[in-house]
Amino acid sequence: MLSILIPVRDETENLDYIVKKFNENLQNIKHEVILVNDFSKDNTLEKAKEICKNKENYKVYNNQKKGLGGALNLGIKSSKGEYICIMMSDLSDDINDLKKYYEIIKKNQLDAVFGSRFIKSSKVYDYPLKKLILNRIFNTFVKFIFLKNYNDFTNAFKIYRSDVLKNLLPFFSESFNIFLEIPLKVMNRGYKYEVMPINWYNRKKGKTKFKIK
């Protein structure tokens, strides 16, 4: 089974869209969707519980330890699938790429598959220029400091074998830095991974509530 882990903060307007997209696109894959509320100031938690109350494969958790890192630690511990894919609640990443992730990690007997928006065959739509420049500077810096042949650490969208992530717990980063911590631990422990091109779309509704620190 595939566990899809989505941290949510102040995403009331996106929740219906999230559920709709997964229901439409993952009918042939046994999966669970784990929504972890991270100290939302709106009624995200209440709406998530209402939307998911009659859906057996949807789970809603409330993070008591504030921060994106705490939300992901909770979601990973609570997952039941053999594989865990982390996605952000804006669904900027393509669910069709999620299906490719799932096929590749099983077929090639991998421990992880990392997506990159910045390799051949990837497509990026409407990425704000300022954010794009900062992204490339940061990822280039990380690549050379840690001597890793990977250029998109800041993208959350990755899939892992569940036992790999659980063996690496706990993750200590409290903010967006966790998306650097997790793949670096996978690489440094010698786990087997591949990188594949992905499509990325700037979010359609609202603004991101998780900030890079």
Language model features: what each stretch is:
Residues 11-14, 40, 68, 94:
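Donor nucleotide-sugar binding loop of glycosyltransferases
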Residues 37-46, 91:
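A conserved acidic beta->alpha catalytic loop
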Residues 13-17, 42-51:
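Acidic helix N-cap motif at the loop->helix transition within catalytic regions
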Residues 11-25:
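Short, well-formed alpha-helical segments that are part of the catalytic scaffolds
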Residues 1-3, 32, 181:
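Cell-envelope/extracellular polymer assembly enzymes that use nucleotide-activated donors
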Residues 63-78, 83-86, 95-176, 202-213:
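Acceptor/aglycone-binding surface of glycosyltransferases and processive sugar-polymer synthases
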Residues 148-149, 171-174, 183-201:
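Catalytic donor-sugar/metal-binding loop of nucleotide-sugar-dependent glycosyltransferases
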Residues 31-34, 45-78:
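Conserved donor nucleotide-binding strand/loop of the catalytic core
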